[in-house]
Design a protein with these regions (language model features):
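Conformational coupling and interaction surfaces
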Residues: 1-4, 8, 14-15, 20-136
């Protein structure tokens, strides 16, 4: 998502050789979603922060769901999770791709390596997140 908004910047970051971890949105980070009932079950009544987060998330979701079932992806938590513990996500090394202006990658096996996250352990990460928020 972020990359398609500034491909030129992405090409610089992916090409400069800096240590880089890529967390793809579609099919990877997008799996880290929660629902109203899940938030109610695990956060409601734990403390003021938890109640605020439940209320805010449900309020925002209702703006687009309008009474239908919904889930919310908690994008930013996955980046922090990679830094915290290698057990929340699975990754491997790949040659740094070249982001194309057509929303595709050009692959070059001569380029430096980056770390590519291919799986978020959703339940483990939410269990940890809910426990930490509940202690706040």
């Amino acid at each position: 998502f972020n990359m398609e908004h500034d491909v030129a910047a992405a090409r610089i970051i992916f090409g400069c050789g800096v240590a880089l971890v890529q967390l793809p949105c579609a099919g990877v980070v997008s799996e880290f979603a929660t629902s109203g009932p899940e938030l109610e079950c695990h956060l409601r009544g734990k403390n003021k922060l938890c109640d605020y987060l439940v209320d805010l998330t449900k309020s925002e979701a209702e703006k687009y769901a309008k009474g239908k079932a919904w889930t919310r992806i908690i994008w930013d938590v996955t980046a922090v999770a990679w830094l915290l513990d290698g057990d929340f996500e699975e990754d491997y090394l790949v040659h740094s791709p070249i982001p194309g202006y057509d929303n595709h990658y050009v692959l070059d096996p001569q380029r430096h390596f980056i770390r590519y996250v291919y799986h978020v352990k959703r339940d483990s990460l939410f269990t940890d997140l809910f426990a930490k928020l509940g202690r706040s």
